[in-house]
Structures are given as structure tokens and as C-alpha cells.
Amino acid sequence: MYLEKLRSQNPLTICITNDVVKNFTANGLLALGASPAMSEYPEDLEDLLPYTKGLLINTGTLTNETWELYKSALDIAEKYGVPTVLDPVAAGAGAYRKKVTLDLLHHHTISLVRGNAGEIAALIGESIETKGVDSAQIDNVGELALRANQQLGIPVVITGKKDAVAVNHQVRILENGSELMPLVTGTGCLLGAVLAAFIHLADEDHYWIVWKSPIGLFDRWRNGRAENLTTRNLPD
């Protein structure tokens, strides 16, 4: 139902994302039925954001210059009431990334945060083993998502072998993930953009089903993609 709604609206979705995944993200959103834009200049954002249904801030390509861009984009989005998704790439990998992410969370309006377990744990002062953008799997992902939702005060999505969605002090688990996903770069980054495309459809009465729809759909797609690009094509 929500996929049909999205496709009928063809929502403009602005993605300020990392250099590695821009083409992958744009094509993924086009396949979904959204209209992607990779705008990276404040004056351009001022023109586009009034017509935008969702904004993604992905901190993968992090510099002092992109940090200023994130802040400008969030300020403009808040002015026009555009909901925002934050993907705090490798927030637990070092002090600089954590500082930038916490600055965005504490001084700007973020509608939803999506990350792996290590990234989300870092945002609430907890520690999970990480290596760059990759995070160790944990058994209690739902409990972590719930703690993050309670501390940050916004919906939290943790993705991995098990996905957890925490909203309004409640949590749901989706077991659609795959251990193969880390073998294909950019799948989590694309999901952040997918959530940004869907976010305008979410309201208090339908929050759970809205997020279950894109996450479940995306998990089924990327499971097949990961398997096709890894296991099936490996030589004997």
C-alpha cells in the first residue's frame, strides 16, 4: 500500500550522501519510484527543499566543509518543515565523527536516525566493536534501539542481520537481514535514502506499518543482491 502511495507521488528526495554510493543511491530511489536529487550547495537547497518530501544526511564523506553543508541543509529543511533522516556513518570509529554526529543531533531537528548497532551505540555513549563503517552483530539489537529512542527522543532504526525499529518507547524486530550484506558496499546507505523517501508518509497512527514496508521490501531486495554478487559468483 505505501509503496503504491510513494510511486503515485514520486517524491523529491534530497540525498547529501557519501561519494562512494551516490550513483547507487540515485538508481535505487529511481527504481523505488522516488525522484532523487544530490544537491550540495546551500543556495540550490534553498530552491529545492520547499518541494522536497525528505532529506537524507549521510556523514560518510566527512570533512569540515561537508559538516557546514549538513548544518546549512538541516537549517533550511527545518525552515520548510522537511523531515530528515540522519545516517551517522562510522560514528563509533573515532572522536571527530562522533563529535559531528552529536552536534547535528543536538542542535538541529532530526526526524529519524538509521545506523548499524555500533553507530547507534556510539550516539548514546555505549560501545560495540567496530571497524570503520562495519559493526559487530549483537543479540539484543531491540534493547539497544529502545535505549537510543528513549535517550535521543526520535525514532531509531538499527539495521543488520536483525533490524530494529524503535518509536515512542516501543520496539519491533524484523528478521529479514543477511550476514552477506556487509559484503556489498552501500546497502545501508541506500536504505537511509529509502527511509527519507518514505518518511513523509509516516504519522503517529501508521508509524510502524510505514517503516515495516520499506525496510522489509529493501531487505528482501538486498538479500538477493548480496547473494547474487557474492556466493553465487564465487569460484569453486
UniProtKB/Swiss-Prot annotation:
ATP binds at residues 114, 159. Transmembrane segments: none annotated. The keyword ATP-binding applies. Pathway: Cofactor biosynthesis; thiamine diphosphate biosynthesis; 4-methyl-5-(2-phosphoethyl)-thiazole from 5-(2-hydroxyethyl)-4-methylthiazole: step 1/1. InterPro entries: Hyethyz_kinase (IPR000417), Ribokinase-like (IPR029056). Keywords: ATP-binding, Kinase, Magnesium, Metal-binding, Nucleotide-binding, Thiamine biosynthesis, Transferase. It comes from the Bacteria. It catalyses: 5-(2-hydroxyethyl)-4-methylthiazole + ATP = 4-methyl-5-(2-phosphooxyethyl)-thiazole + ADP + H(+). One of its GO terms (molecular function) is ATP binding. Substrate binds at residues 38, 186. It holds the Pfam family HK. Its EC number is 2.7.1.50. Its cofactor is Mg(2+). GO terms for biological process: thiamine biosynthetic process; thiamine diphosphate biosynthetic process. Catalyzes the phosphorylation of the hydroxyl group of 4-methyl-5-beta-hydroxyethylthiazole (THZ). HAMAP family: Thz_kinase. Belongs to the Thz kinase family. This is Hydroxyethylthiazole kinase. It comes from Streptococcus suis (strain 98HAH33). The gene is thiM.
